[in-house]
UniProtKB/Swiss-Prot annotation:
Any one GO MF annotation of this record: identical protein binding
Keyword vocabulary terms for this entry: Plasmid, Protein transport, Secreted, Transport, Virulence
Protein name: Type 3 secretion system needle filament protein
Record's subcellular location: Secreted; Cell surface
Keyword Transcription: no
Family: Belongs to the SctF family.
InterPro entries assigned to the protein according to its UniProt record, in alphabetical order: T3SS_needle-like, T3SS_needle-like_sf, T3SS_needle_YscF
Residues in coiled coil: none
Any Pfam family hit: T3SS_needle_F
Entry GO CC: cell surface; extracellular region; type III protein secretion system complex
Gene field: sctF
Keyword Transport appears in the UniProt entry: yes
């Protein structure tokens, strides 16, 4: 996996923010699935759709968290090597 650095002034926060558009889309889909499920909680298809959307959202957030953590760890290792 490679990460393309957009410019010299990027930060971990800006890297994390690149995930925000996808997160907003997934959050909207998750909310819609939950609203449908709340109207008919005994429908197994709606439950499966909600669980699927929740899983997608969780995986996306984990990818965001892991990406930022990996970059942070690499940066920390570089700093440690300069000491």
């Amino acid at each position: 996996m490679s990460v393309t650095v957009p410019n010299d002034d990027w930060t971990l926060s800006s890297l994390s923010e690149t995930f925000d558009d996808g997160t907003q889309t997934l959050q909207g889909e998750l909310t819609l699935a939950l609203d449908k499920l709340a109207k008919n909680p005994s429908n197994p298809q709606l439950l499966a759709e909600y669980q699927s959307k929740l899983s997608e959202y969780t995986l996306y957030r984990n990818a965001q968290s892991n990406t930022v953590k990996v970059i942070k760890d690499v940066d920390a290792a570089i700093i440690q090597n300069f000491r």
